[in-house]
Regions:
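Acidic, metal-coordinating catalytic segment for phosphate/diphosphate chemistry
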Residues: 1-26
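Short, solvent-exposed loop/turn segments that connect beta-strands within catalytic domains
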Residues: 24-30, 88-91
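Conserved Nudix-box catalytic region and its N-terminal flanking loop in Nudix hydrolases
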Residues: 28-70
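Nudix hydrolase/Nudix homology domain
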Residues: 40-42, 108-161
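A short coil-to-beta-strand element that immediately follows conserved catalytic motifs
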Residues: 69-80
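Active-site-adjacent beta-strand/loop module that shapes the phosphate/pyrophosphate-binding cleft
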Residues: 80-109, 119
Length: 161
């Protein structure tokens, strides 16, 4: 679906994968956000699909490279969001599939350690920090989850409504 204000020189929607790194703390469920390299905006670790890898695995790798987190990724996305990526001569509409990641380990240093900032925040704060409205909506939907929830894995596979 294209937006009404699509720039004339834009290409069709492209696909990316993202990780939604989560951990359980005494405050409740926390989300790991990273800054983008070009503009410094807060977002989730994301990137292009990787040849020879399933999308959920590519999302897991992006989380390790961009945020220094390791864990178990859901094989199914929890949702999607869209954003406009500015290129030299055009804007591309990107649809991003978001895969929850139950974080089991954080690294002291990682591939993009010196290129990005990392922040662990509650879902409601994460929703305020990101600039993509659809991603913010997805993060707000996680806000009611608290430490009393038995297991993050209950969030990993979305329940049908």
């Amino acid at each position: 679906m294209r937006k009404a204000n699509t720039p004339a020189n834009s290409s069709p929607r492209l696909h990316q994968v993202a990780s939604l790194p989560m951990r359980k703390t005494e405050r409740g469920i926390e989300i790991c956000l990273v800054t983008t390299r070009e503009t410094g905006r807060w977002t989730v670790p994301k990137g292009w699909p990787m040849k020879g890898r399933k999308d959920f695995d590519a999302a897991r790798i992006e989380a390790e490279q961009e945020a220094g987190v390791i864990g178990k990724s859901s094989k199914k996305p929890i949702g999607t969001f869209e954003y406009w990526k500015r290129r030299e001569t055009q804007f591309d509409l990107i649809e991003v599939a978001v895969y929850p990641l139950k974080v089991t380990k954080t690294l002291a240093r990682w591939k993009e350690y010196e290129e990005r900032q990392v922040r662990w925040v509650l879902p409601i704060e994460a929703a305020r920090l990101v600039s993509e409205p659809q991603l913010a909506h997805l993060l707000r939907s996680l806000a009611p989850i608290t430490e009393e929830d038995a297991d993050i894995s209950s969030m990993i596979v979305p329940k049908p409504h």
